[in-house]
Amino acid sequence: METLLKVLSGTLLWQLTWVRSQQPVQSPQAVILREGEDAVINCSSSKALYSVHWYRQKHGEAPVFLMILLKGGEQKGHDKISASFNEKKQQSSLYLTASQLSYSGTYFCGTE
C-alpha cells in the first residue's frame, strides 16, 4: 500500500517582517506526495531579503527550526532536506528529497 504524505506550506510572519512590510509569499500552498517523491517549496518577497528561516510544524506540536540561510551564503541542508537562497530573485527554495512519512507537516518561512 502506498503511503501518501501531505505537506502544507504556510507563512510564518516575524515581528521584524511586519515592521519592514516584507510579508513572504510561499508556493505551492499544499503538496501531496508519495513516499520517495521530491518536492520544492518556494518563499519569496518583493523586498530585499537578508535572511530566510525555515521551520516545520507537525499537527498539535510547536514549530521546529530547520535552518537559516543568510544573504551571500551557500546552499544548506541536512539529511534529505536542503534549501537555497537566490538573492537576485529574492527567493529561497526548500527541497524535500526522497520524502518520508516523517516529513509530513506544515512548512514555514520567515524573512528579514
UniProtKB/Swiss-Prot annotation:
This is T cell receptor alpha variable 30. Keywords: Adaptive immunity, Cell membrane, Disulfide bond, Glycoprotein, Immunity, Immunoglobulin domain, Membrane, Receptor, Signal, T cell receptor. Residues 1-21 form the signal peptide. It is found in: Cell membrane. The keyword Nucleotidyltransferase does not apply. Alpha-beta TR is a heterodimer composed of an alpha and beta chain; disulfide-linked. The alpha-beta TR is associated with the transmembrane signaling CD3 coreceptor proteins to form the TR-CD3 (TcR or TCR). The assembly of alpha-beta TR heterodimers with CD3 occurs in the endoplasmic reticulum where a single alpha-beta TR heterodimer associates with one CD3D-CD3E heterodimer, one CD3G-CD3E heterodimer and one CD247 homodimer forming a stable octameric structure. CD3D-CD3E and CD3G-CD3E heterodimers preferentially associate with TR alpha and TR beta chains, respectively. GO terms for biological process: adaptive immune response; response to bacterium. Disulfide bonds join 43-109. It comes from the Eukaryota. Pfam families: V-set. Its main location: membrane. The keyword Nuclease does not apply. InterPro entries: Ig-like_dom (IPR007110), Ig-like_dom_sf (IPR036179), Ig-like_fold (IPR013783), Ig_V-set (IPR013106), TCR_alpha_variable (IPR051896). One of its GO terms (cellular component) is T cell receptor complex. V region of the variable domain of T cell receptor (TR) alpha chain that participates in the antigen recognition. Alpha-beta T cell receptors are antigen specific receptors which are essential to the immune response and are present on the cell surface of T lymphocytes. Recognize peptide-major histocompatibility (MH) (pMH) complexes that are displayed by antigen presenting cells (APC), a prerequisite for efficient T cell adaptive immunity against pathogens. It comes from Homo sapiens (Human). Glycans are attached at residue 42. Residues 24-112 form the Ig-like domain. PANTHER family: IG-LIKE DOMAIN-CONTAINING PROTEIN (PTHR19339:SF12), T CELL RECEPTOR ALPHA VARIABLE 39 (PTHR19339). The lineage of its organism: Eukaryota, Metazoa, Chordata, Craniata, Vertebrata.
